[in-house]
A protein has these predicted regions:
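Surface-exposed loop and membrane-interface regions of Gram-negative outer-membrane beta-barrel proteins
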Residues: 1-38, 43-45, 56-70, 104-106, ...
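Extracellular/periplasm-exposed beta-strand and loop segments of Gram-negative cell-envelope proteins
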Residues: 13-15, 23-29, 158-160, 174, ...
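Signature for the C-terminal beta-barrel architecture of outer-membrane proteins
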Residues: 45-49, 67-217, 248-250, 255, ...
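Flexible internal linker/loop segments at domain or repeat junctions
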Residues: 219-244
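Outer-membrane beta-barrel biogenesis signature
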Residues: 241-246, 253-265, 328-337
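C-terminal functional modules
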Residues: 244, 276-283, 290-311, 320-331
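Outer-membrane beta-barrel "beta-signal"
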Residues: 250, 315-348, 358-361, 365
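Cationic, low-complexity basic patches in intrinsically disordered or flexible, solvent-exposed regions
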Residues: 350, 354
Length: 365
């Protein structure tokens, strides 16, 4: 899977590598990338192995995610084995040696190389309670030593039918994170999350509480997780403050009826109250809103608004409009091979240039 990112309008923004630091950040630098290239081996229905550059998403993507809302996905050069020994039970193990981040290879922090990353996860559907997942994520990242950590946790998610078309929803999670590998700091910090909710017809309402603990010097972090999806769309808390973070939020999703022949539109409203987990500091509040409307097959327009009102952390923030698409274009096998060969050549050339060497080592790809 290859991807090409380019701008259509003026370069009046900071893409993190163009040097325009006086402009707002839009972290989508132009580039041509080999986004995914992997081989799958499935000797039996219950066992699957994937080797190569791949997108990895676990559970709600809090800890491991491909950041696919950005123009450039986050992928791992990894080996992953998935086993389903019996119905309702799954076991996963992954080993990754390279992280290809959403910032792109031209960014100083766009690629984390020579890592020692272990991903362990097991889940079981325990009807009628729900799905229980245990996990252990061990990150040793020499290029970003403060992101090296080991996180062990337990997650429960489920739903119960109520009268009519109503459902009770619930999720709860606990994890402990400690220093690991090249991290020079010593710490042990907890993560807690509770999210009860109710779904009635086309309306789903959730009230959640999430805590990422901090001790005043260091805080729990999620370097490979979905940063944008949590703690507000204004992205003020992609890095947890040293005093930690408590996020109390309300999340309402509504599937809209068909209008003028347009089906599948939806809207979402969120409210957040952010506080430190240590002490009584109030960081601020945030309103988020989204309207998503399918235009044609494979193309959706999303109007997204985020308003963060600062009390003692960050500054006020507003955001705007984006389009998302998932086009499926029929092409011939010869065209597929031509496109693949061209993409591989361009990406290998970029890889060599990013290393400032004259030869490419396949073992590093």
């Amino acid at each position: 899977e290859g991807e090409a990112i380019t701008r259509l309008g003026p370069r009046h923004y900071n893409d993190t590598v163009n040097g325009r630091t006086t402009y707002p950040v839009v972290a989508d630098p132009s580039d041509i990338l080999l986004n995914q290239a992997w081989v799958r081996f499935k000797p039996a229905q219950q066992v699957e192995t994937i080797v190569g550059r791949q997108a990895v998403n676990f559970d709600n993507q809090r800890w491991v995610d491909s950041a696919n809302w950005r123009q450039n996905d986050q992928t791992l050069d990894a080996v992953r084995v998935a086993i389903k020994p019996v119905a309702g039970v799954s076991l996963d193990y992954g080993y990754a040696w390279r992280v290809n981040r959403a910032l792109g290879p031209r960014s100083p922090q766009g690629i984390w190389r020579e890592n020692d990353i272990h991903l362990l996860r097991g889940s079981a559907n325990t009807k009628p309670i729900g799905t229980i997942t245990a996990y252990g994520y061990f990150f040793n990242i020499p290029d970003a030593p403060l992101s090296s950590s080991k996180t062990v946790g337990l997650r429960l998610v489920g739903e119960q039918k109520m009268s009519g078309n109503a459902k009770l929803l619930y999720a709860a999670e606990y994890a402990n994170q400690r220093d690991f590998g090249t991290n020079p700091r010593t710490y042990s910090l907890d993560y807690l999350a509770f999210e009860p909710g109710v779904s009635v017809g086309v309306v789903t309402t959730k009230i959640g509480w999430e805590k990422l603990e901090g001790n005043g010097a260091v805080a729990l972090q999620t370097p490979l997780g979905a940063l944008h999806a949590f703690n507000g769309w204004a992205d003020k808390f992609v890095n947890t403050p040293a005093a930690g973070l408590r996020d109390l939020y309300v999340d309402v999703s509504i599937k809209l009826p068909a209008v003028a022949g347009i089906k599948g539109a939806s809207t979402r409203l969120k409210w957040h109250d952010f506080n430190a987990s240590r002490g009584s500091i109030n960081y601020g509040r945030e309103w988020d809103a989204m309207l998503a409307v399918p235009i044609i097959r494979g193309l959706t327009a999303s109007l997204i608004y985020a308003e963060y009102r600062a009390e003692s952390f960050g500054s006020d923030f507003f955001t705007s409009l984006r389009f998302s698409n998932n086009f499926i274009v029929p092409i011939t096998p010869a065209e597929k091979m031509t496109f693949f060969a061209w993409t591989v050549w361009v990406c290998l050339k970029r890889e060599v240039e990013s290393r400032n060497v004259i030869s490419y080592r396949a073992s590093d790809f």
